[in-house]
């Protein structure tokens, strides 16, 4: 029997590869000769660096950068040496979880550290980038990131504007005269699963501003400032299009990448499936195993396990999913390519017990074993 596992991380419990190897253990208890290919899975958000580094023989780098509030933070990112590709999660340098509730204010939070991570990767020889832009604490239109890469956003006196969304209102000139030259050699695949434009009722300020600490007055101001910034950019940079789907992602980071770098915005799961060449492994498999920490109706809306299932169904493969918890509305996943799904929990336990790494791996192996017994 040939089996491919591609399981998303169980957040706070198991990494993608740990879940896959636990499933492989369960399979081998039943069929010691089974050929099991354990592949990484992520959706472009949390866990993407970890999954791609572990699954693609990459290495982890740590760099001290400017955090969202201007304080130094250590950001972890990955490098896949074979393709000189850097894998970066924006949340590691400008994440909402790095800002305490009482300090959340997008007027002050900056993406400067994201640019510093990119610059560090460039200095280490990377020219391809996979960047996940979820979980941000910012609404600065990506200006901070671009400043770190050498773009200058100047006020009427010729000085760099202040960090955070508050600086947007003072931008009078944008120049690329000091951009690091290697940036022109770089290509970015930006994991973006939202379609919001930069401004307006569906723009980043209105939709995501409140969770970042914005008041109604701030939202109105930031939306106007981002609009003016976009208009200024359009006069100097022909790719600027604030209405393009996804430009409002991560407080305008989508707009920054599309306008000022050689970037494409793509579904996170599609990037991961492509980069890991999962389809090549699925073609020869008898069975595909996927899953995530919690399966529900949202899973069927295009989350990582369904991305795997769609790829598997393209080749007529059977797909089974395993999850830490399964909600009743998860049956929608059956219509999205997952033939059957199973919860891993063995009984009534506390959440803390269920999420312990050793328990989670054991539960995965035990449940997979029993399902495989039915198929042998």
Language-model-derived ranges and their functions:
Residues 1-133, 137-376:
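N-terminal loops that bind phosphate or other acidic moieties
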């Amino acid at each position: 029997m040939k089996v491919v596992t591609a399981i998303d991380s169980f957040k706070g419990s198991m990494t993608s590869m740990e879940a896959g190897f636990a499933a492989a253990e369960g399979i081998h208890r039943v069929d010691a000769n089974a050929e099991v290919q354990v592949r990484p899975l992520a959706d472009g958000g949390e866990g993407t660096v970890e999954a791609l580094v572990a699954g693609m023989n990459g290495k982890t780098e740590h760099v001290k950068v400017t955090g969202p509030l201007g304080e130094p933070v250590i950001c972890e990112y990955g490098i896949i040496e074979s393709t000189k590709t850097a894998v970066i999660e924006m949340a590691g340098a400008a994440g909402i979880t790095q800002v305490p509730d009482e300090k959340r204010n997008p007027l002050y939070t900056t993406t400067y550290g994201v640019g510093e991570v990119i610059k560090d990767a460039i200095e280490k020889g990377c020219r391809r980038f996979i960047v996940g832009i979820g979980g941000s604490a910012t609404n600065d239109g990506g200006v901070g990131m671009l400043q770190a890469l050498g773009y200058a956003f100047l006020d009427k006196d010729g000085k760099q504007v202040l960090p955070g969304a508050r600086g947007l209102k003072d931008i009078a000139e944008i120049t690329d005269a000091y951009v690091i030259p290697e940036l022109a050699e770089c290509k970015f695949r930006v994991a973006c699963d939202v379609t919001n434009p930069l401004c307006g009722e569906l723009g980043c300020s209105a939709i995501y501003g409140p969770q970042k600490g914005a008041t109604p007055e701030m939202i109105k101001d930031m939306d106007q400032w981002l609009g003016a910034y976009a208009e200024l950019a359009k006069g100097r940079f022909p790719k600027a299009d604030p209405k393009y789907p996804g430009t409002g992602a991560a407080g305008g980071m989508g707009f920054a990448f599309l306008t000022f770098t050689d970037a494409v915005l793509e579904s996170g799961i599609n990037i991961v499936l492509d980069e890991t060449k999962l389809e090549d492994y699925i073609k020869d498999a008898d069975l595909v195993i996927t899953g995530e920490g919690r399966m529900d109706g949202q899973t069927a809306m295009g989350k990582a396990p369904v991305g795997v299932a769609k790829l598997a169904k393209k080749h007529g493969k059977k797909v089974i999913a395993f999850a830490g918890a399964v909600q009743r509305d998860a049956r929608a996943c059956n219509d999205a390519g997952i033939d059957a799904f199973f919860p891993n929990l063995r009984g009534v336990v506390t959440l803390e017990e269920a999420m312990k790494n050793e328990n989670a791996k054991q539960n995965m192996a035990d449940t997979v074993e029993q399902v495989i017994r039915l198929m042998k």
